[in-house]
């Protein structure tokens, strides 16, 4: 009779055998997170009545392609000023929170 194995053991075996690359998995998780966040930004843009990326781009002073890139998940490579301009164009305010253990500092942009 085969005993059920827990996920931790299966994962450890896969890593040891080279079937799973933890670094690639971490990068994939970050890319997925960025894509989900970017999609949420696009949904908010549309919900606020800005149907076209070109309209937001004009408010920001950038190209429509730049807004498209931002909304396609390129958040980790987006400059803070660009993200701030995007949020401001939608009528929002960007907040950044730095955490150091139990200490936090809120930075406003």
UniProtKB/Swiss-Prot annotation:
The UniProt record lists the HTH cro/C1-type domain at 41-97
Which keywords label this protein? DNA-binding, Toxin-antitoxin system, Transcription, Transcription regulation
Question: Per its UniProt entry, which superkingdom is the organism in?
Answer: Bacteria
Q: Which GO terms describe its molecular function?
A: DNA binding
Q: Report whether Transcription shows up as a keyword of the record.
A: yes
Q: Which PROSITE patterns match?
A: HTH_CROC1
* SUPFAM superfamilies named among the record's database cross-references: lambda repressor-like DNA-binding domains (SSF47413)
Q: Would the keyword Ribonucleoprotein turn up in this protein's UniProt record? A: no
Give one Pfam hit by family name: HTH_3
The UniProt annotation gives the DNA-binding region as 53-72
- Record-linked CDD domains: HTH_XRE
Main function = Putative antitoxin component of a type II toxin-antitoxin (TA) system. Its cognate toxin would be HigB3.
The protein's name: Putative antitoxin HigA3
Tell me the organism.
Mycobacterium tuberculosis (strain ATCC 25618 / H37Rv)
Gene name as annotated: higA3
């Amino acid at each position: 009779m085969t005993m059920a194995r827990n996920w931790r053991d299966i994962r450890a075996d896969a890593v040891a055998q080279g079937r799973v690359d933890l670094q690639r998995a971490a990068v994939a998780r970050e890319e997925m997170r960025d894509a989900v966040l970017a999609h949420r930004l696009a949904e908010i843009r549309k919900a606020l009545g800005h149907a076209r990326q070109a309209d937001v781009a004009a408010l920001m002073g950038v190209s429509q392609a730049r807004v498209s890139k931002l909304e396609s998940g390129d958040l980790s490579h987006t400059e803070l000023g660009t993200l701030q301009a995007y949020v401001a164009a939608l009528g929002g305010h960007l907040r950044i929170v730095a955490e150091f253990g139990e200490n936090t500092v809120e930075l406003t942009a």
